[in-house]
């Protein structure tokens, strides 16, 4: 089960390794560095090494494990900060006595789970019950915010059977908590199991994404919504607000469990993001957000190959919590760094480059990643539903959205939130370009908004979006001829579009009144602007100039409402404001006539 190194090229090692299998986990060299077989030619294996290869030399041993790179799934996973191959960074720091990650620290020294931790196990089944792979056998209370459900793992070797033994009590993570008698023999189930990171976890049926994932960001929730089980991309150049967007989503998105994957970002940016995440409180309970979060960190100064593993690792952890019946959100920042890692490894093992040097299978890998999102009926004998939502940032060089990663990503996502440097430099945040963004989930989430907020939601949303498009067309005329060339109706459109931008789309992520924005507040802010538009049209027909309408007290207050009205008071105060606005405009018309 071992071989020898033949040559080393950066993160790639070629070894004479008879019997090696694709994507098999191996240990490379005397210091046993993590590696994964990415190409096999006869008895020769090309290995991408997940640690720094400095000091390796030809002739050193390569040891096969016989199994693929796998995630360890079970209690003690919540609240941990892992590297790309699921080694706990805090444990590594204690072992190495150094803030920098020492090489050769394997799962034997720093296991992903604390297998000796004890939990009070409460069974959900009893002896004699029939169970299938994927069924919940019991639960442990891991944190104040999360109950960790223990599953009968849906591994290929597991079959339906009858519970032979299960008992309540205090157990270590590595203890057997149930025995299940199947046709293939008795299966001893522990609190944890392993799952290959590149293999999607099974489910019974994929459901349409019909419920919106409320994020508290108005531009996202109202204009370009994402559904639970959907996939979204946030492309943008340096300084356009991608990291703040990811932070806002991680804090306010109404998902039960959050997995931020910091993939290939700069070390100081990742450290800053981590410090911010560690300080965040859950808005609903005031408890630390870390009690419903697991973080994966793989900065740009860490070995390039581990970036690929970190994305798959985060998705696998997300699927595991989805299988417990939770709504899970995976936030990957950024997939461009992951693609760059793929490009480097592919070129080093001699694969034919495609567009801009990326491997020809880049679209396939992106599809594999985004297709793991979904709202599904889970495995097991009882019908349960869980969802995995993926939102990933993309960092196109120079903000060029035609480069391969961004252009291929567009094919596999349902929501596209491009960040505009022009908006970011003018201090308009979130800097989502409303003319380039889109969402394929508007039709599917419309029923939820109509039922839970207002039947008028779709009509008003579409009207505001069309006004923004008209504004862009009118701006061309204004640049050439000035506002004097516009009719009163067109001037009114520009005034309303200004209100949409300043009073609705703009949002201060650090203002507790402005962010998060509850669905009812979002709708009523939108309705207030729409009322100004509709009543204004009638006033203009009656001869009132657009400039006079803009000088009304209520209209002047419109852009400030988002920062004055809290979510709790939104229904009462905004409804009253809309009535006052209508009254003022109609009084203006009456005085004119």
From Swiss-Prot:
GO molecular function, one term: ATP binding
Annotated ATP binding sites: 236-243
Biological process terms in GO annotation: proton motive force-driven plasma membrane ATP synthesis
Presence of the UniProt keyword Translocase in the record: yes
Example of a GO cellular component annotation carried by this entry: plasma membrane
Alphabetical list of SUPFAM superfamilies matching this protein: C-terminal domain of alpha and beta subunits of F1 ATP synthase, N-terminal domain of alpha and beta subunits of F1 ATP synthase, P-loop containing nucleoside triphosphate hydrolases
Main location: membrane
Location within or outside the cell: Cell membrane
Known catalytic reactions: ATP + H2O + 4 H(+)(in) = ADP + phosphate + 5 H(+)(out)
Keywords: ATP synthesis, ATP-binding, Cell membrane, Hydrogen ion transport, Ion transport, Membrane, Nucleotide-binding, Translocase, Transport
E.C. designation(s): 7.1.2.2
Pfam family, one: ATP-synt_VA_C
InterPro entries: ATP-synt_VA_C, ATP-synth_a_Xtn, ATP_synth_asu-like_sf, ATPase_F1/V1/A1_a/bsu_N, ATPase_F1/V1/A1_a/bsu_N_sf, ATPase_F1/V1/A1_a/bsu_nucl-bd, ATPase_F1/V1_b/a_C, P-loop_NTPase
Membrane-related topology note: Peripheral membrane protein
NCBIfam families to which the protein is assigned, alphabetical: PRK04192.1
Family classification: Belongs to the ATPase alpha/beta chains family.
Its biological purpose: Component of the A-type ATP synthase that produces ATP from ADP in the presence of a proton gradient across the membrane. The A chain is the catalytic subunit.
Assembly: Has multiple subunits with at least A(3), B(3), C, D, E, F, H, I and proteolipid K(x).
Name recorded for this polypeptide: A-type ATP synthase subunit A
Species assigned in the record: Pyrobaculum arsenaticum (strain DSM 13514 / JCM 11321 / PZ6)
Phylogenetic lineage: Archaea, Thermoproteota, Thermoprotei, Thermoproteales, Thermoproteaceae
């Amino acid at each position: 089960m071992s071989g020898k190194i033949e040559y080393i090229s950066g993160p790639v090692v070629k070894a004479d390794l008879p019997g090696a299998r694709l994507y098999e986990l191996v240990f490379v060299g005397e210091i046993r560095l993590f590696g994964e077989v990415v190409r096999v030619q006869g008895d020769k294996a090309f290995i991408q090494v997940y640690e720094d290869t400095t000091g390796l030399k030809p002739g050193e041993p390569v040891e096969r494990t016989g199994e693929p790179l796998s995630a360890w799934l079970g209690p003690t996973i919540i609240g941990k900060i892992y590297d790309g191959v699921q080694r706990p960074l805090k444990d590594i720091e204690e072992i190495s006595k150094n803030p920098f990650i020492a090489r050769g620290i394997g799962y034997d020294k720093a296991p992903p789970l604390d297998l000796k931790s004890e939990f009070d196990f409460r069974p959900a089944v009893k002896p004699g019950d029939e169970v299938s792979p994927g069924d919940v056998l019991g639960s442990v209370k891991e944190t104040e915010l999360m109950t960790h459900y223990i599953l009968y793992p849906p591994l290929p070797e597991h079959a339906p059977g009858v519970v032979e033994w299960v008992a309540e009590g205090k157990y270590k993570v590595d203890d057997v908590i149930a025995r299940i008698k199947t046709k293939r023999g008795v299966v001893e189930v522990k609190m944890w199991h392993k799952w290959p990171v590149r293999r999607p976890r099974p489910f019974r049926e994929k459901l349409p994404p019909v419920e919106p994932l409320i994020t508290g960001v108005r531009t996202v929730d109202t204009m370009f919504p994402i559904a639970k089980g959907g996939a979204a991309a946030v492309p943008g150049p340096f300084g356009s607000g991608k990291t703040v967007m990811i932070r806002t989503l991680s804090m306010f998105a109404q998902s039960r469990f959050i997995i931020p994957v910091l993939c290939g970002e700069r070390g100081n940016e990742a450290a800053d993001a981590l410090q911010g995440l560690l300080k965040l409180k859950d808005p609903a309970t005031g408890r630390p957000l870390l009690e419903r979060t697991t973080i994966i960190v793989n900065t740009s100064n860490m070995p390039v190959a581990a970036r690929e593993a970190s994305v798959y690792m985060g998705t696998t952890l997300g699927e595991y919590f989805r299988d417990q019946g939770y709504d899970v959100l995976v936030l990957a920042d950024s997939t461009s760094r992951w693609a760059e890692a793929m490009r480097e490894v592919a070129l080093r093992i001699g694969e034919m480059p495609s567009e801009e040097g990326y491997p020809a299978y880049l679209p396939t890998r992106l599809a594999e990643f985004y297709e793991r999102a979904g709202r599904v009926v889970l495995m097991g004998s009882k019908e349960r539903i869980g969802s995995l939502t993926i939102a990933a940032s993309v960092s196109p060089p120079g903000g060029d959205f035609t480069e391969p990663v961004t252009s291929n990503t567009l094919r596999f996502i349902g929501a596209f939130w491009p960040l505009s440097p022009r908006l970011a430099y003018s201090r308009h945040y979130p800097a989502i370009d409303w003319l380039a963004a889109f969402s394929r989930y508007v039709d599917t989430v419309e029923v939820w908004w109509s039922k839970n907020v207002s039947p008028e939601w779709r009509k008003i949303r579409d009207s505001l979006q069309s006004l923004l498009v008209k504004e862009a067309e009118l701006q061309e005329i204004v640049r050439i001829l000035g506002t004097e060339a516009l009719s009163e109706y067109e001037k009114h459109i520009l005034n309303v579009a200004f209100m949409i931008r300043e009073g609705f789309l703009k949002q201060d992520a650090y203002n507790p009144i402005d962010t998060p924005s509850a669905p009812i507040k979002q709708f009523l802010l939108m309705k207030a602007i729409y009322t100004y538009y509709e009543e204004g049209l009638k006033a203009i027909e009656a001869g009132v100039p657009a400039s006079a309408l803009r000088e009304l007290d209520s209209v002047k207050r419109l852009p400030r409402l988002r920062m004055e009205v809290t979510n709790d008071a939104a229904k009462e105060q905004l409804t009253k404001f809309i009535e006052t606005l209508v009254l003022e405009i109609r009084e203006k018309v009456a005085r004119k006539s």
